[in-house]
Amino acid sequence: MTVEAFISALNDAGITLTEQQIEQFQRYFELLVEANKQFNLTAITDEKDVYLKHFYDSLTVAIYVKALQHQSSTLIDVGTGAGFPSLPLKIAFPQLKITMVDALQKRVRFLQDVVDTLDLKNVSIVHGRAEDIGQNVAYREQFDFATARALARTSVLAEYTLPFVKVGGALLVMKGAAAEQELADGQQALATLGGTLSSAFDFKLPNGDQRVIQVVDKHKKTPKKYPRQAGTPNKKPIA
């Protein structure tokens, strides 16, 4: 996906970027490729692939969950890695208040460099494990939305993310082709943690890759015991 195709595809979806935003995406790409030479941030470094599989893919969640486009929502991105989907969302929709969580200090430093270089406001970067931060009252049940992209299977991902979402908010799960089976396997975890699937959107990226966005509404508080201590959700998923 060329830069021009990226802009055009967003226009077709009703999202118009300013010149400044287009420049911010290009600078983000440059910073990503440069930092990737020092340590592994992503296997995707070709410009056309980054614009499709990182930038455009990240923004698809706002195409289907339009509240992200217009409201000054609080959003936490758990296991953000190189900043996806939260940084593309922040660039495209500056009114969002973003918190990014990652367990690796090198990635946190990279994210801070991007935020500083692009002069992004209302962005917080938290270094640590989701299981630990999810028990911190400063973050627990404080967010309108939580996102996670390719973080873990749904039953595990739910325990990492739903504790951050306030009652009345939603978890936005971004998955590939295996999403339906994962969701079926994760139903007990969602219910236990206070979530209910409200909608799902199946679509394809312009290159034909299958994607699914699942919206999980938070309808009751997460029991205090969740998330369990670091490592436990992955070893012993809620079932």
UniProtKB/Swiss-Prot annotation:
Disordered, as annotated region: 218-239
SUPFAM superfamilies per UniProt: S-adenosyl-L-methionine-dependent methyltransferases
Subcellular location: Cytoplasm
GO cellular component: cytosol
Pfam family, one: GidB
Transmembrane helix keyword on record: no
Binding site for S-adenosyl-L-methionine: G79, F84, A130, E131, R149
EC number: 2.1.1.-
UniProt GO MF annotations: rRNA (guanine-N7-)-methyltransferase activity
Function, in words: Specifically methylates the N7 position of a guanine in 16S rRNA.
PANTHER family, per the entry: S-ADENOSYL-L-METHIONINE-DEPENDENT METHYLTRANSFERASES SUPERFAMILY PROTEIN
Cited NCBIfam families: rsmG_gidB (TIGR00138)
Entry's family note: Belongs to the methyltransferase superfamily. RNA methyltransferase RsmG family.
Protein name, entry field: Ribosomal RNA small subunit methyltransferase G
